[in-house]
Amino acid sequence: INDLPVPRMSRDPDADRVGMACKDSNGEWVLVNGNQTCMIFLYYIIKNRIAMGKMKGNEFVVKTIVTTELIKAIADKNNVEMYDCYTGFKWIASVIRENEGKKQYIGGGEESYGFLAEDFVRDKDAVSACSLLAEICAWAKDQGKTLFDVLMDIYVEYGFSLNHTVNVVKPGKTGADEIKQMMVNFRTNPPKELAGSEVVLTKDYQSLKATDNKGNVTDIAQPATSNVLQWYTADGTKVSVRPSGTEPKIKFYIEVTGEMKCPKCYAEAEKKAMQTVEAVKVSLGL
């Protein structure tokens, strides 16, 4: 069965998350992460609706703030509105509810392997996601492509992105105090640069304020506050940091973006991005 080119998919026991793997251009099995999965789903949905003439101009998609910015690039280039929300599908469901009867939801997800293709469930749903994935694989095959080819097409058209998460575990009451102090320190003394690139925008979801590198402050449109900080650099890197709500750890979500001119450039783009990730970790003392 490992000789077959078709991708593999699996869901978790409560059927709300889907994971998948496919063969790369060298015939080696690779895992498709949650950000890539969400990108592939939304790319297909948008492209398919355009091809079938179903776009009415009122469509929107939703992602969480720690999910890849490539989804915004896909949405923007295809004139689809995109909403950012907090981690958790209750927030995606809230955006759907707010726009009900006015705009059409066509998909949304988060980096932790959750996706919702339709609005009748209002929670992440692996059953419909697995069905959609099978449809995408058939669509790709009809074009003589693999799922990995589709991912490469996305990177070439919309830009390359690599996401890396760092979990810093701090157990016990002492650890909780350390995490709290880390967030205080990041707010009072935020990084001026990451991996040698200037931080041009800082978002603080606790104060709901965004501050650029010239000191200009704007409001962040979210329905509530959250203990999350984000830094955006001049070279397209995004770092999000937040304490876990369920475990004794603080999480750093690092996204490095860049150009990828052709599918054969993937290995080099990935290598370069990982070097930037490691440099970002050094900048943050991780």
Describe the residue ranges of each PLM region.
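A generic beta-sheet turn/junction motif
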Residues: 13, 245-247
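Short, electropositive, low-hydrophobicity segments enriched in small/polar residues
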Residues: 19, 23, 38, 118, ...
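Catalytic or ion-translocation cores adjacent to nucleophile or general acid/base/metal-coordination motifs
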Residues: 33-45
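N-terminal small/polar loop signature for handling phosphorylated ligands or for N-terminal nucleophile
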Residues: 1-19
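Short Gly/Thr/Asp-enriched flexible loops that form oxyanion-binding sites at enzyme active sites
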Residues: 16-34, 71
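Phosphate-binding and adjacent anionic-ligand microenvironments
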Residues: 6-7, 28-30, 48-242, 249, ...
